[in-house]
Regions:
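Metal-dependent phosphohydrolase cores
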Residues: 1-199
């Protein structure tokens, strides 16, 4: 495939740029478009970055901001439909994104923290009309996460699909700026555990 900026990405080579991720992730709608709200992957990644703990850790915020970035090349396939091969391709693209940004793979602790924040975000999205109706009833022992729901509602109050879809819109620019800011922070943090794999 060719990205927004013209980068060639295949199963074997290439990685989308920060601009590609910012623009394209705001055009990919979560939950296969089943929600009452057209809620993009890019907005989801911003939400996850707000929910990851500890939130003063720039490495965790960075990996949260990038946790679905590979989907701009492989699409957002709902988990029950994703094959083992599709997951392997997504993982390979994700690894190339990290390499292109000069960052290591996240530590196991960071992966777990991002996974938890991702789950909290998904449940909040399911509660606020971003997924298909009845999402919360498909989740075992579902309990509303008021903190995550409140954070999501703050975004929803300001969100418009037009400002997400346009490359020069507010949300692609906000996402790009946030990634670049956090990248600068982690480049100054040479002793963090997630830095151990970096050259």
């Amino acid at each position: 495939m060719l990205t927004y900026t013209g980068i060639h990405v295949t199963k074997e080579f290439g990685a989308p740029s920060i601009v590609d991720i910012a623009v394209q992730s705001m055009r990919l709608i979560r939950f296969s478009g089943a929600g009452e709200v057209n809620w993009p992957i890019g907005m989801h990644m911003l939400l996850v970055a707000d929910l990851v703990v500890p939130n003063d850790d720039p490495w965790r915020r960075l990996y949260a901001l990038l946790h679905d970035a590979a989907e701009v090349a492989v699409a957002d396939v709902p988990r029950p439909m994703k094959t083992t091969e599709a997951r392997a391709v997504e993982d390979a693209v994700e690894a190339r994104i990290y390499a292109s940004l000069g960052i290591p793979e996240p530590s196991d602790d960071t992966r777990q923290a991002v996974k938890l924040a991702d789950f909290r975000a998904a449940l909040a999205e399911g509660s606020c009309g971003c997924s298909g109706r009845g999402f919360e009833y498909t989740q075992t022992h579902y309990l509303p996460d008021n903190g995550a729901i409140s954070t999501l509602r703050e975004y929803l109050a300001r969100f418009t699909i037009d400002e997400a879809f346009r490359p020069e819109g507010h949300w692609p620019k906000a996402y790009e700026a946030r990634v670049r800011t956090v990248l600068r922070e982690v480049q100054q943090d040479r002793y963090h555990p997630d830095r151990a794999g970096a050259a």
